[in-house]
Each structure stands twice: as C-alpha cells, then as structure tokens.
Amino acid sequence: MAILSNTEFGILRLTISRAQKRNSINAEMFDTMTEALSRAASDDAVRVVLLQGGEQIFSAGADLEEMRSQPEVLDRAMTNFFAALRAFPKPVVAQVTGPCVGDALSM
C-alpha cells in the first residue's frame, strides 16, 4: 500500500510512500486517506493528523498517468479527499520535506 498509517501518542501519521513515482498520489491513495480521515474524525485516540512524504520528496502531486487514463476516477477521489480534509474537525499538519508540487500543495 502506498499510504502508510499508524497512530501513536494521539498522532495519526499518514505517510505517502510511493518513491518510485516521486510520491505521486493516485485515486486509491486519495481514497485511503479519505477513509483514514473519516475514521479519525470520530476516534478519541486521535488528536492530530500528520501528513508526510518521504525523506527526499513530499509529493509530485496527482498521478499524471492516471489523470490521463482515468480522469473521472482520480477527480472523484481527489474531490472527496479535499472535502474530507476541509471538514476535518481536528488539526492537520503537513510535514513537507523536499519538493511539494501540484495538488500536494493543497494539503
């Protein structure tokens, strides 16, 4: 899975882990993060969400290959994720290390 998730000390850490594609985010990854936010919203053990990428790059943004081949699928997943992010009732922090471009900037 390209989104790693773990909760420790009240922090839900969502890590973009797709180094071979410069951490570009596809629909499945957006859906995974949306589902994680949905669960975390009602989980009292989660006090904050930390979004992070790899050591060399945060994210190259949306997966351009998927954008060309399945634009409606990626668009739906992105729309759902950013709506969930805007409505999320707890603090969200992006730990940006290295380049962060495209839709990743909106995080």
Positions of the model-derived regions?
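Conserved CoA-thioester-binding segment of acyl-CoA-metabolizing enzymes
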Residues: M1-G54, A83
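Glycine- (often His-adjacent) and acidic-residue-rich active-site loop
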Residues: G53-A84, C100
